[in-house]
A protein has these predicted regions:
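Long, highly charged amphipathic alpha-helices
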Residues: 6-10, 77, 81, 85
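Surface-exposed beta-strand edges and their flanking turn/coil or helix-capping segments
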Residues: 40-41, 53-56, 78-80, 117-118
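Repeat-unit-sized solenoid/scaffold elements
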Residues: 69-73, 77-78, 104-110
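Acidic-leaning, charged glycine-interspersed low-complexity segments
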Residues: 86-137
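Small/polar-rich, solvent-exposed N-terminal microdomains that initiate assembly or binding
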Residues: 1-55, 89-101
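Oligomerization/assembly interface segments of phage tail-like spikes and tubes
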Residues: 57-75, 82, 123-135
């Protein structure tokens, strides 16, 4: 099962997260029409450990989860929920009902904070708290 599918399933399965962002969880880019607060996740890098025969033994995947809000406090609250709930627990695929087993361990590595000017003329800034995690699996 893909790491992208696993990441989305873990984020959207946690009611503590969806209570804050509803269904506003998207990969790689936030649509301009998507309101706040929201989450944008990406998997920008994947390192492979291979055995002598060339087959992949272990994968280390970087997962970035951007928690966006018009309030820096709310962006941090969403980020804390992400850290709490993005664990190596088994996640079930909503469409097939099959357990997604690709991730064996999750390690939070850093948190970054930034802000952006509003794109819509609103006086409120957009605050982004990014949680960086490393997923390890086969």
């Amino acid at each position: 099962m893909s790491y992208a599918k696993w990441a989305r399933a873990v984020i959207t399965a946690a009611s503590d997260i969806t209570d804050l962002v509803s269904t506003r969880v998207t990969p790689y880019l936030r649509n301009r029409e998507t309101g706040f607060p929201c989450i944008v996740y990406s998997l920008p890098r994947e390192d492979l450990e291979t055995v002598a025969g060339g087959s992949v033994q272990t994968r280390h995947v970087e997962l970035q989860v951007q928690c966006m809000s018009r309030s820096h406090v709310e962006a941090d609250e969403i980020a804390e929920e992400v850290i709490q709930h993005v664990t190596a627990q088994t996640v079930t695929d909503d469409t097939t009902g099959i357990a997604i087993q690709c991730v064996e361990a999750v390690r939070p590595t850093s948190i970054e904070r930034e802000f952006q000017d509003s794109y819509d003329g609103s006086p409120d800034l957009i605050y982004i708290t990014t949680v960086n995690l490393t997923l390890t699996g086969a």
